[in-house]
């Protein structure tokens, strides 16, 4: 009854108006699962490869080749297989692709099928997706990291860092955490308007004002927090995504907005200064993706008082994560399903992190869709943290709203532990 009888891929558009892959997987019992695949702007060099068409159509970004692979080779391989055996299905697609980075069939094609198989199987059992993937122990709601000021590759402004996030560590529930964030978001908008800055939003729904430095952005956020009546550090903490690979050139970190360059030692000292000066509890990609020595220095300097997250460093890849664990680089991993390309490999990366005492944070991409899969995945894996953008744009709010629903479904079983960083 749960055997795959059809797979239909199609080209749809993501939140940036670029083509992406959507997949329907149909089972013999009549149910189907549908998933749409996200896409990143600042992508790590070691990520699985999404297949694009090239040529003039959609300025080269079409995904008809990936769709053809889904409707052809992949369906031929998976037709008749049992959707309940996620690992075997994912391994079959990896073997069919035959490359180390999924470049032949495309990680976007493979991932769309992988996620849709899980959704179809969950429906077959009559279970919510988070319960199907995570079992009976899935009841931890994530602390959201809300990206309310955008810079770097996510915005057209001089700010070098990519994301400035608020984290409602003192909220009693996930629903209240969303309220805290929304109130600060709208207060920040008023502050920016009063100061003469534009309030257009970037790819992830955060504001993209023409600020010059990280400190300027953080100070605006601090004012917004206190203006709402919240206590910085106690109720609302701050997080940064430096995306430092984007401005790492010739072994230097080139801050164009500030007009200065920092070597590795100076970069470590600068980030340590920010952590000492503000209630910053998490920094993502503080060093460049291949600056392993810099990562080790940063972890030794502030890893005991700040979550240091590897995104471009680890790219949701268990092998790279194990290298980092051995070296003592970072203490957490960002999990993006499209960086690795299958649900099974994603779950393996999370398990590898947890076994080593590293935290795992589930994340969206800057090019998103209305698909809320990562909301369920966060609860399923008890990761306890999620990055899914600001309090604007329906592609971001789809995930927050799904988490509110999950919290409601869980009832008295639901737990929200905003103060994870104090444990």
Curated annotation (Swiss-Prot):
Question: EC no.?
Answer: 4.2.1.11
Active site (UniProt): 204, 336
Q: Which PROSITE patterns match?
A: ENOLASE
Q: What Gene3D superfamilies does the entry give?
A: Enolase-like C-terminal domain, Enolase-like, N-terminal domain
Binding of Mg(2+) occurs at 241, 284, 311
Pfam families in the record: Enolase_C, Enolase_N
This one is known as Enolase
Q: Which gene encodes it?
A: eno
